[in-house]
Amino acid sequence: MDSMRRMNAYVKLNFQRCLSQGKTLVICLCLAVFFYLYFGDVRGGLMESGQKIGIMEMFLVVTNNMYTSFTIWIGFVLIICDSPYRDDGVYQYLLRTSRRSWLWGQIVYIVAITVIYFAYIFLLLLLLIVPQVTFQTAWTTTFVKMINAPFGYGISNYFSFPVSVMRQTTALQLFGRCIVLCMMIGMATGFLTMMLHMLWPSGPGIAIGGIGIAMDYWATVVRVGVTSKYLLFISPFSMSRVGNLSTTAFNRVNPTFSYACLFLAGMILVPLAVMNLKIGRYDYS
């Protein structure tokens, strides 16, 4: 019980520090303004036509479109780059007291902040289209029309989703896969960032996320040379675009959902093992 109480205290302390930073508020406001400007008067377009669109479809679009996806992941990297928060003398204190409770507190915080971040993205999209929203699990005809003619719905920016994927899977199936991948990518980014801080206390916390964003940009935007093709199989942020994943094991061009889950699971387990080993040693300072 004492260990659980200490762990909860560390989680609470991390959230207090995160919310007390002006950076967090700025990121949340920037995301809200970005999506508002990006989708324009989408609510007005839907109300004028008397149609409704699925919230799951909107979430799939923003996570599959490279520009909105870049924005989402950059915001997440900027929030998570401070994990774990470092105080002078805290590690020496932990060596004599609750090292495991501290470690579990950091892990729970990273998982929780990942869930909250994407819940916030989901809420922003919901506010953009309410009350013209539906929660049906199948693809809506409105979504198909919006892909073909986004200007008719007040959207002046890029709005697209692969129709070939829509013919093979339902919106609910793809949404579930997208949520799983986003959660795993977020946790992997947080754990790798935390591992970097534990191995290199004075190192740049944004390095892990920065490298991931650069890999994603090279694999999806630059697309120069053979390396860009192979980067799709090792770039975690690229795997969040479920519309670009292969739907068959015989397609060697893009990774499958199963491969992405296994790869990301490895990215989660490796830093956890390293951190568990590091926190148990008395040379951690």
Residue ranges with predicted function:
Residues C18-L19, R100-S101, L196-S202, G280-R281:
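Membrane-interface helix-boundary motifs at transmembrane edges
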Residues V11, F15, L19, R100-V111:
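Interfacial transmembrane-helix starts/ends
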